[in-house]
Every structure is written in structure tokens, then in C-alpha cells.
Amino acid sequence: MTIKAILTDIEGTTSAVSFVFDVLFPYAARHLPDFVREHAGETEVAAQLAAVRAESGEADADVERVIAILLQWIAEDRKVTPLKALQGMVWAQGYRDGQLKGHVYPDAVQALREWKARGLDLYVYSSGSIQAQKLIFGCSEAGDLGSLFSGYFDTTSGPKRESASYARIAGAIGLPAAEILFLSDVVQELDAARDAGMRTLGLAREGGSLDGHPTVASFADILVE
């Protein structure tokens, strides 16, 4: 069946894992406490703080306790939706201020542009919030790549290692799963996408293979039929 859409992961796939762990996460950890203190009374931020209290089971946590929980989640690399949303808000401020530029591999930039020009629909699925995804591509070192994408998906669509998440995304895209190619550097994510009926391709940028899936080292090596 012909591929009509491409769904791509970010970390380790379109972008260096080091950008997320060495640049974005430390930036959020440094700036998140003051950001929460300054904006805790705003509706959008307050909603996420309430979600932190619910997720942690600490309904009476004050702002300082919520900040401590968030910093602990960052240290543990927890994929928790309210944390991702708040990190996205902090990063948005950093991108607006010119302190951050999203990293996207040059081979990924070229391939994404070529696929878009060929009429393929491009989508992102990452554990980072949709807001954070848009910032990485919209404020990238290669310029604004946001217009290349038709949609973004995050953990609100479900965990990345569960096949139901990919079935849900295929439904949202409006295509049979078999017409969607999923790109990732994580075997468990590729397995889940395949179980949902998607085509899969692994990215192993340091070489090697991802068990049970076709694997390439660069977007330049991807042939979409």
C-alpha cells in the first residue's frame, strides 16, 4: 500500500537527543521555578499546577511543593503531561527571547522539505508537548519549518509504547494505518506502531539496527515509495 503520510518522532530521530537533554531540559530546570512563581495565578498555568497536584496525589500542595515535584519529575525524566506543558511554556519564552534555537538534523530538514513538496502529509508524535514540538520546528536553526507539518501529537494521544495510541493517531489523521510510515529510534515505539498496522522505519544514527524493523542511519537513506 502506498505511503501517504509520515509520522515522525523527534528525539534521536529528527533531532539530537543531546539537544533535549543537554539544552532544553537544563534550561527548563533553571527557569521553571521562577516561571511558576511569576505566573501561578494565570489560568493556563494554574490548570497545569492543578494537574500536578492530581497526578502526584498531593491535593493541598502549595506552589513551592509543586515546584519541588516538577523538578523531581525532570530529574527522573518522567513523561507527565502537566510537566511537559509547563516546560513548553518556559521554552516558548526562551525561543521568543532568542535564547533557544531548535536543533533539526540537516538530512531531516532536506527530506522533510522534499516529502512535503511531493505531497506527503507530515506529522509529529513526541513525548514532548505539542507546544514544545512546534517550537523546535518553528524556531529551528534551519528557520521556520512549522509549515511542513499537518499536525502534531503528544502524550494526550496516549503512551508512545502502546499500540492503541497509534491506532488513535491514524484515526485522527484520517488514513488507514498501513498508509502511514512511522519513524523512530526506539524499538518499543516501532513495535507499537507496527502492531497498530503502521509501516515502520528505525533511525539508528550511530549505526546498528533496531530489531525487527528496517533501519537507516540518516533521513537521506529513506526511500518512500
From Swiss-Prot:
| Gene3D superfamilies xref list | 1.10.720.60, HAD superfamily/HAD-like (3.40.50.1000)
* Pfam families assigned to the protein according to its UniProt record, in alphabetical order: Hydrolase
**Classification via InterPro entries:** Enolase-ppase_E1 (IPR023943), HAD-like_sf (IPR036412), HAD-SF_hydro_IA (IPR006439), HAD_sf (IPR023214)
Recorded coiled-coil stretches: none
- Which free-text remark accompanies the cofactor? Binds 1 Mg(2+) ion per subunit.
Q: Which UniProt keywords apply?
A: Amino-acid biosynthesis, Hydrolase, Magnesium, Metal-binding, Methionine biosynthesis
- CDD domains the record matches: HAD_EP
A GO molecular function held by the record: 2,3-diketo-5-methylthiopentyl-1-phosphate enolase activity
Record-level GO BP terms = L-methionine salvage from methylthioadenosine
Spell out the PANTHER family in the cross-references.
Answer: ENOLASE-PHOSPHATASE E1
Q: What's the family?
A: Belongs to the HAD-like hydrolase superfamily. MasA/MtnC family.
Quaternary structure and partners: Monomer.
Which protein, by its recorded name, is this?
Enolase-phosphatase E1
From the broadest rank down, the organism's phylogenetic lineage runs:
Bacteria, Pseudomonadati, Pseudomonadota, Gammaproteobacteria, Pseudomonadales
Gene name of the encoded protein: mtnC
